[in-house]
Curated annotation (Swiss-Prot):
Residues that coordinate or bind Ca(2+): 60, 62, 64, 66, 71
SS bond partners: none
Subcellular location: Mitochondrion inner membrane
Alphabetical keyword list: Calcium, Membrane, Metal-binding, Mitochondrion, Mitochondrion inner membrane, Repeat, Transmembrane, Transmembrane helix, Transport
Record flagged with keyword Transcription regulation: no
Spans of repeat Solcar: 184-270, 278-363, 375-463
Molecular function via GO: ATP transmembrane transporter activity; calcium ion binding
Mitochondrial matrix side: 208-244, 302-337, 399-437
Predominant localisation class: mitochondrion
Name this polypeptide is given: Calcium-binding mitochondrial carrier protein SCaMC-2
GO biological process: ADP transport; ATP transport
Length: 469
């Protein structure tokens, strides 16, 4: 007779037996043969429940909330294939063994810095024969029915650029795991991210339009406040006017995201890194270049967004009418007004956003990632909000100058200005504070934008067949 038992090794702890796998459809006398018994201490029951739920969700094909024997065997086979891919990605030397240096290198590539002692501690937990290296059998035996603590899990749970949309698509693209690339899940993540961005931008569009108005029209002599700005917009064009410019802002998500992702993947190959995931500085370079390519491709849409947000009632009948009138009156060059400060703003925004997010991620993983790399909703939202806020704060003066240059030609009697002359003019007439006009509504929309995009992203993932967090 066969019996499958898993024992979690514990020393000197009160243990309780739990059985939760049985084979349905078998004669009653055989049901006890195919079972899984797990012995765990009572104080670790919460960890056990999370672990059980993860395994059941992964293998439950008929969605009845439990695994029968056939589903369990299928889960083991499928999970072993995934573990093989992870093992190969960690085995930098291709010698069939993983040592402490390879563990440190793999985590360092993701921005997670650990000491050699910490790497050796991880190694010892899996090393059965005391060689201070892990072969495939040791790796498989440890992880097959053990809470996962691996590189793909960190990538899976800590996606940032794909999930959060605060209206400025200047973040460094996310990495995808080997499995996500091979199964085609990557494009589902991008579609979910695009849909989340569309909903998020639409919900926060009134604050975004107010920011643009304050960037262009607010000054010492015209001290526009938030309440006054909303009142002015509603008085001029009614409640619908709060969403002016939102259509083009949503429309540009798809081409910009697609171009940036494709450019990022090509630049990764040009960098020539043999790692599956890039190091932090390589990600910054590749992400900034990809962002520059994407922004260059869709920049006329950025100009249209600003002009549509600033338009008066009846000025344009729609986006195409706006584009035709700009082309006829100002020429093709008008569609690239503010291009230089926009490009210069990519590096501080992307660099600081990435650095802050990776620092917060690393701090959390070092301190709290005991059984899983899953940070939970609130930690993820907090990290995304803080990193986006810091990135925007650093690049905001360039964003303000860009917006004023985009709007300048549409203002009657406005002289032609350059980036440097506009900086000097603002500093001379308004001081350093003038470079941060509209910052308040911009920051006010960060938390709702991040929260809305996260909720919509998670729901769209389920709809598109991506395994939920």
């Amino acid at each position: 007779m066969l019996c499958l038992c898993l024992y979690v090794p514990l020393i000197g702890e009160a243990q309780t037996e739990f059985q939760y796998f049985e084979s349905k459809g078998l004669p009653a006398e055989l049901k006890s043969i195919f079972k899984l018994s797990v012995f765990i201490p009572s104080q670790e029951f919460s960890t056990y429940r999370q672990w059980k739920q993860k395994i059941v969700q992964a293998g439950d094909k008929d969605l009845d909330g439990q695994l029968d024997f056939e589903e369990f065997v299928h889960y083991l086979q499928d999970h072993e294939k995934k573990l093989r891919l992870v093992f190969k990605s960690l085995d930098k030397k291709n010698d069939g063994r993983i040592d402490a240096q390879e563990i440190m290198q793999s985590l360092r590539d993701l921005g997670v810095k650990i000491s050699e002692q910490q790497a050796e501690k991880i190694l010892k937990s899996m090393d059965k024969n005391g060689t201070m290296t892990i072969d495939w059998n040791e790796w498989r035996d440890y992880h097959l029915l053990h809470p996962v603590e691996n590189i793909p899990e960190i990538i899976l749970y800590w996606k940032h650029s794909t999930i959060f949309d605060v209206g400025e698509n200047l973040t460094v693209p996310d990495e995808f795991t080997v499995e996500e690339r091979q199964t085609g899940m990557w494009w589902r993540h991008l579609v979910a991210g695009g849909g989340a961005g569309a909903v998020s931008r639409t919900c926060t569009a009134p604050l975004d339009r107010l920011k643009v108005l304050m960037q262009v029209h607010a000054s010492r002599s015209n001290n526009m406040c938030i309440v006054g700005g909303f009142t002015q917009m509603i008085r001029e064009g009614g409640a619908r006017s709060l969403w002016r410019g939102n259509g083009i802002n949503v429309l540009k998500i798809a081409p910009e995201s697609a171009i940036k992702f494709m450019a990022y993947e090509q630049i990764k190959r040009l960098i020539g890194s043999d790692q599956e995931t890039l190091r932090i500085h390589e990600r910054l370079v590749a992400g900034s270049l990809a962002g520059a390519i994407a922004q260059s491709s869709i920049y006329p849409m950025e100009v249209l967004k600003t002009r549509m947000a600033l338009r008066k009632t009846g000025q344009y009948s729609g986006m195409l009418d706006c584009a035709r009138k700009i082309l006829a009156r100002e020429g093709m060059a008008a569609f690239y007004k503010g291009y230089v400060p926009n490009m210069l703003g990519i590096i501080p925004y992307a660099g600081i956003d990435l650095a802050v997010y990776e620092t917060l991620k690393n701090a959390w993983l070092q301190r709290y990632a005991v059984n899983s790399a899953d940070p939970g909703v609130f930690v993820l939202l907090a990290c995304g909000t803080m990193s986006s806020t810091c990135g925007q704060l650093a690049s905001y003066p360039l964003a303000l100058v860009r917006t004023r240059m985009q709007a300048q030609a549409s203002m009657e009697g406005a002289p032609e200005v350059t980036m440097s002359s506009l900086f000097k003019q603002i500093l001379r007439t308004e001081g350093a504070f003038g470079l941060y006009r509209g910052l308040a509504p911009n920051f006010m929309k960060v938390i709702p934008a991040v929260s809305i995009s996260y909720v919509v992203y998670e729901n769209l993932k389920i709809t598109l067949g991506v395994q939920s967090r």
